[in-house]
């Protein structure tokens, strides 16, 4: 495994970085208590938006993390206002016909249930898990990402869903219904079998044939089909760590190690990847700070389950990544309307992909959230929202 000599964030530095992040959340409460943040910033400032994007759960997740860190009731009050909005969204089925129920409801409503016993949050999250079940394709044994369920052009799943299926594992725990767990297990088995290449890299999206056999991997937001989209690799790393948390199946740690090894092999010296890891840092291609924050969370989660030698290596890597983020990518606290991390990439167009260009070299809401989550993990024994 590739190692680095970079500075590793100390406990004191983690506490200060988290305090700065909480200050940034506090600064933004007047802007975004009654609305959501757009998926990405514009000139490093987030436009407000209605609760109708797949990314709307990350800002409330930041508020809950700030509440955990400070105990300040203003964060709890603001977070519960958001929970009510998410309960309304799932009740009215507003833009929920896709697979991103975990991204929406784990850091908002599951968090509310775990932290303050919110029945509204619990019930909304269970309803979101039920909605996610409607995306299941039994022939291919996967949760379809996008589009209508009878559209052959969308008969596929994506690596991001590794962070959506934990909602199903949680729902199985709180309801006692094994059906959620069975669907989660089926989808992750399909993902592990097809979405991770032999070298540990990942496909963004993977198409299946109508008879349930694999068809092939394609990109949407990576540079091209056979390149190495950084955020997809990060979802694979963290998702496999959480998969082990819920199942204690060693195959998840095996996949984690291989995906991590590939990720590390493609990092520049400051440990923050380009948006697609096909590119070297001297290429001038934009970085994606959010990928580093996601991987740091995965390292700290997986480190709970291995021997101390390996755990210490993984924790050091996470601390090095976070030190780099805090020193060179973090927003100065108190910057009204901005996020936590600069230099994220949502969706960069290439000659070979199908995405809409948005949020290039900007703050991205999930990067902000996972940066705070990783810092929180360094300051306490944190219970997953996922």
What does each of the following model-derived ranges do?
Residues 1-386:
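Glycan-recognition and catalytic cores of secretory/periplasmic carbohydrate-active enzymes
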């Amino acid at each position: 495994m590739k190692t680095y000599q970079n500075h590793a964030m100390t406990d004191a530095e983690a506490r200060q970085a988290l305090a700065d992040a909480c200050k940034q959340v506090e600064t933004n409460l007047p802007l975004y208590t009654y609305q959501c943040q757009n998926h990405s910033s514009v000139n490093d400032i987030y436009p407000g938006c209605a609760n109708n994007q797949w990314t709307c759960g990350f800002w409330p997740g930041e508020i809950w993390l700030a509440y955990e860190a400070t105990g300040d009731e203003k964060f709890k009050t603001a977070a519960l206002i958001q929970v009510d909005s998410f309960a309304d969204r799932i009740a009215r089925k507003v833009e929920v016909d896709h697979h991103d129920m975990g991204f929406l409801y784990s850091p908002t409503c599951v968090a509310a249930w775990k932290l303050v016993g919110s029945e509204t949050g619990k019930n909304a999250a269970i309803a979101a898990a039920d909605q996610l079940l409607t995306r299941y394709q039994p022939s291919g044994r996967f949760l379809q990402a996008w589009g209508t369920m009878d559209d052959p052009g969308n008969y596929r799943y994506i690596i991001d869903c590794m962070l959506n299926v934990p909602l199903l594992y949680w729902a199985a725990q709180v309801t006692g219904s094994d059906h959620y767990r069975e669907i989660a297990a089926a989808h992750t088995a399909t993902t592990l079998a097809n979405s991770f290449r032999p070298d540990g890299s990942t496909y963004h999206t993977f198409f299946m044939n109508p008879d349930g056999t694999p068809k092939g991997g394609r990109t949407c937001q990576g540079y091209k089909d056979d390149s190495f989209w950084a955020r997809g690799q990060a979802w694979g790393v963290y998702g496999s760590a959480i998969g082990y948390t819920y199942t204690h199946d060693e195959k998840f740690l095996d996949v984690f190690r291989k995906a991590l090894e590939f990720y590390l092999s493609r990092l520049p010296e400051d440990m923050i990847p380009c948006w697609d890891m096909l590119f070297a840092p001297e290429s001038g291609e934009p970085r994606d700070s959010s990928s580093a924050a996601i991987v740091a969370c995965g390292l700290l989660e997986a480190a709970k389950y291995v021997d101390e030698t390996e755990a210490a290596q993984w924790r050091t890597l996470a601390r090095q990544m976070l030190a780099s983020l805090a020193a060179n990518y973090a927003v100065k606290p108190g910057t009204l309307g901005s996020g936590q991390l600069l230099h994220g990439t949502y969706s960069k167009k290439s000659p070979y992909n199908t995405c809409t260009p948005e949020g290039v070299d900007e703050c991205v809401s999930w990067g902000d959230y996972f940066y705070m989550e990783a810092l929180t993990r360094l300051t306490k024994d944190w219970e997953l929202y996922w």
